[in-house]
A protein has these predicted regions:
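A substrate-binding/cap region within the structured catalytic cores of diverse enzymes
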Residues: 100-256, 261, 271-273
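Alpha-helical scaffolding within the catalytic cores
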Residues: 31-43, 71, 99, 251-259, ...
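C-terminal regions of proteins
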Residues: 20, 26-27, 276-413
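An N-terminal structural lobe/cap that precedes and organizes the functional/catalytic core
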Residues: 41-86, 91-98
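Structural recognition of the beta-strand scaffold that forms the well-ordered cores
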Residues: 54-56, 83-88, 149-152, 266-270, ...
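Solvent-exposed loop/turn segments at secondary-structure junctions
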Residues: 59-63, 90-94, 155-159, 273-277, ...
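Bacterial Sec-dependent N-terminal signal peptides
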Residues: 1-24
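N- or domain-start disorder-to-order transition segments that initiate the globular core
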Residues: 16-52, 108-109, 137
Length: 413
């Protein structure tokens, strides 16, 4: 009996010491953020200066993530000159946002958001919309050489908008090589035709390659972006192209990086939770950021990921039966949604209604390769990261407490 008690005591003291090690570290590596005032991001300034691409990760649905995104973007623009927002949008959507940022035409911006509203997507919300308006207001205070622009690297989301952009490239050009493409983009889009479109785009991309000189004469210095649009269109059907969404994002990033000469530019963008992880998830595989950091791309070793974790918050969920948005609990200490290992330590070090930044990659960090603040339990089972090649899934965590939901735009928007 005494041996059993001694063994239990040793195990308990070991677990307590391990937890205390994490808590002690976190106490000395945290900053409380004021999203409505002068937010302090100095804790990550050194990493921002020494790296190229900062990725903010969040599970879509919490309002505070939009506030964090704008606050961090504004800080990076001011301190290290970040202008290029690498967006989880397709290129046509980002082009429309850029047009709005330039001329303030809200009809153009509304067209982007109307697609999400029509498709009951979380992104069709006031908070995202207002963030774009705030970015335009910020740009108007900056010289043109420092203004923020968006670059979309996602698969095609809004085909109608995408076809309009391609049609703008075609313009009034007359050439037999363009006729088949013009027929496709001027036809009304139907989801049932996605395989047909994907195959057509693949074949058309090959046509461009075979007739490069003639296409160069037609498009001049616009040809690289035109080719990018066609190649991304070929990824539309994963079944036919063999290119899933994370792989398409990765390929598109590499293409635009070269076309837009991002080599010496600072890059930033907010992405979905799993897209931002720098390690693959066991039994799920790699996503955008993990593909990038594992590659031989020039920016691969210059990526910093910052992930937002919600506690006692709310998010918007579409109720198909009631055909309306409903406000649901959003807390990553809940196994019915996702319980992140070690998140109770963050909760113990923060207060209600706070937003707190934790740096987990400092020298002698106890988090390296542990899975703490990454591994977790979901209804589908255990979520486990593969840490064989990297120490951290991300370098920073932001705990969002008591965030409201994203306020949905009305169906009549």
């Amino acid at each position: 009996m005494k041996k059993w008690i001694l063994a239990f005591a040793l195990v308990y003291s070991s677990v307590y010491a391990q937890e205390n090690k994490f808590v002690s570290y976190l106490k000395n590596n945290k900053t409380v953020l004021d999203l409505n005032g002068k937010t302090q991001w100095e804790q990550l300034k050194s990493d921002a200066e020494q790296n190229q691409f900062l990725i903010l990760g969040e599970s879509h649905g919490a309002q505070d993530a939009q506030l964090i995104d704008f606050s961090l973007l504004k800080y990076l623009n001011k301190t290290i000159g970040t202008q290029n927002y690498i967006a989880e949008l397709d290129y046509a959507q980002s082009s429309c946002i850029n047009e709005y940022l330039k001329n303030g035409n809200e009809t153009i911006l509304n067209n982007v958001f109307r697609y999400w509203v029509k498709n009951n997507a979380q992104w069709g919300n006031y908070d995202f919309y207002n963030k774009i308006i705030k970015i335009r207001a910020l740009n108007r205070t900056l010289p043109k050489t420092k203004q923020i622009t968006f670059s979309g690297i996602d698969k095609v989301q809004d085909f109608d908008l995408y076809f309009k952009l391609i049609d703008k490239f075609l313009g009034t050009k007359k050439n037999l090589l363009l006729d088949s493409l013009r027929l496709i983009v001027n036809d009304s889009y139907n989801d049932s035709e996605i395989i047909k479109i994907s195959v057509f785009a693949k074949n058309y991309f090959e046509k461009i390659e075979k007739n490069r000189i003639e296409f160069e004469q037609l498009f001049g210095n616009q040809l690289p972006i035109f080719k990018y649009l066609i190649q991304n269109l070929s990824y539309s059907s994963t079944k036919k192209s063999g290119v899933n969404r994370p792989e398409a994002m990765f390929r598109n990033y590499k293409e635009l990086y070269s076309i837009l000469h991002f080599e010496n530019k600072k890059l930033y963008g907010m992405w979905g939770y799993f897209h931002s992880h720098q390690i693959p998830v066991q039994f799920v595989g790699e996503d955008f950021a993990s593909k990038l950091v594992s590659s031989d791309h020039p920016s691969a070793k210059k990526v910093i990921s910052i992930v937002c974790l919600p506690i006692d918050s709310k998010y918007n969920v579409w109720d198909s039966k009631g055909a309306t948005w409903i406000k649901q609990p959003f807390s990553y200490d809940d196994k019915t949604l996702l319980q992140i290992d070690g998140i109770e330590n963050l909760k113990a070090l923060t207060t209600n209604n706070s937003t707190t930044l934790f740096k987990i990659n400092s020298l002698n960090s106890p988090f390296a390769k542990t899975g703490q603040l990454f591994n977790g339990t979901a209804p589908q089972g255990k979520l486990m990261g593969d840490f064989r090649r990297r120490d951290f899934a991300y370098q920073y965590v932001i705990l969002m407490r008591n965030s409201d939901w994203l306020n949905p735009l009305p169906k009549t928007f």
